[in-house]
Structure formats: C-alpha cells, structure tokens
A protein has these predicted regions:
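Short acidic-hydrophobic, aromatic-tinged amphipathic segments that line or gate anion-handling sites
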Residues: 122, 198-207
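Surface-exposed amphipathic alpha-helices with a cationic face
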Residues: 85-93, 147-148, 152-159, 179
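Short, acidic loop-to-helix structural element flanking the phosphoryl-transfer center
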Residues: 68, 72-106
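Acidic, Mg2+-coordinating phosphoryl-transfer loop and its flanking beta/alpha structural elements
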Residues: 98-103, 162-202
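Active-site neighborhood of HAD-like aspartate-dependent phosphohydrolases
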Residues: 1-52, 56-57
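Phosphate- and divalent-cation-binding pockets in alpha/beta enzyme and binding domains
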Residues: 26, 83, 107-111, 176-177
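Short, basic/glycine-rich phosphate-binding loops at helix/coil junctions
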Residues: 54-71, 128-135
C-alpha cells in the first residue's frame, strides 16, 4: 500500500545505493592523485572555490591522455548495497518511480541505473574528445551541497511534485536534497541525524516502514 501516494523515490548513489563513498575518490586512488582531490575538497568546503572549479581541478590532476575506456574500467568495479535490488523491485511492484541524484560521475550512474532498472538519473559528466580522450573540463549538473536544485529540475522535467516524493541519502551533503522531498531518509550507522526532519534508517528496506 502506498498510503502517502508517493510517485517517486530518489536516491543518492555513492554510499547509499553503492557501498563505496565516492566515484571521484575511486579514480583519484587509481591514479594516485588523492592529495589533489583532498586539497580541492578542502577549498570547496571552505567556500573558496565553487563546484565547477572543484571538478576542473579534480579532472586536471589526472594523467593527460586518459581515455573513456580506462575511466569506465575503474568505475566498473562497484558494489551495490546488498538490499538495494530488493528495494528497487518492491518500488516497481508498488508502481513508484525511481531516480538517482548524485554528484558522482555519469558513466557510473548510467551503469547502475541500467543494472537496477532505475527510471531516471542525473549526475555530473566527464567530457571526451573524438578519440575518447578526457577533456579537462567536466559538465557540472549536481552540486554536492545543493542536490535539491538538480532534483527539482528533474521533477519539473518528469512532472512530479516534490510532495509526492521521498529522498534517500547518507551524508550531510544530502540534507538540502532530503529536505526537498515529502520524506527524507538518512542511511547512517549512527542514530545522530543532523536534522530533526530527517528520518534515520540503518537499511534501505526501512523506507517501507514509512510509506
């Protein structure tokens, strides 16, 4: 039963649907450029650079001539959270649409959406030239701290009001996104959720206790 008439369930990707925390960190780790990513993250969180500049610095720190194939190979080694397939099957059975809203990378979002039969996704993009080589400037669609903006844009496109949606994330970066839905859930191993409006869950399946 869908007591709240929920039409869409939107999920963060890294750390929520997937077990790992960041597709960007996975690529930095592969190329040995974690220190560059950490430095850019610090500047971003301190408000000294915006997210587009953060992306540009991340991408520029990777080796020149990197190909789409290599990036896709790094991102293909992902682990879907154990209960996630069950959750998406149940949402389909209830005729509730599904979406990913992630500040991660579109290559990964597209693959996970296909694996789990997720209806919609929005993510940040990498750009490649005609030979498949990485270009230094990405496509910024989802600011980590303002996922709600990308989410509202998606909802407007598909014609669903936010009051008929739920949102699920796992970090403080997701707060604006979670609060923009009818119900917001934070997947966390601690019971200390940083906002009283957000519902704490230990497993994704617990969203069904509330809808």
């Amino acid at each position: 039963m869908n007591q709240l008439e929920i039409k869409l369930a939107a999920f963060d990707l890294d750390g929520t649907v997937l077990e790992h925390n960041s597709s960007w960190v996975a690529i930095h780790r592969h190329f040995g450029t974690e220190h560059n990513g950490a430095a850019s993250l610090r500047l971003y969180t301190e408000g000294k650079i915006d997210y587009r500049e953060f992306m540009r610095r991340d991408i520029s720190s990777w080796p020149k001539g990197v190909t789409r194939e290599e990036i896709a190979g790094v991102l293909s080694d992902y682990r879907i959270r154990r209960e996630a397939p069950e959750v998406f099957r149940e949402l389909r059975a209830r005729r509730i649409g599904t979406a990913l809203v992630t500040s991660g990378i579109d290559i990964l979002a597209r693959d996970v959406a296909a694996d789990l039969e997720i209806d919609h996704w929005v993510a940040n993009g990498l750009r490649f030239d005609g030979n498949g080589k990485l270009l230094p400037k990405g496509v910024g669609r989802v600011d980590p701290t303002r996922k709600d903006i990308a989410y509202q844009r998606l909802l407007s496109k598909i014609g669903i009001p936010s009051k008929k949606t739920i949102a699920i994330g796992d970090t403080i970066y997701d707060l604006a996104f979670l609060k923009s839905a009818r119900l917001g859930f934070m997947l966390a191993h601690t019971t200390r959720v940083p906002d009283p409006e957000i519902i704490h869950i230990n497993k994704l399946t617990q969203i069904f206790d509330h809808i």
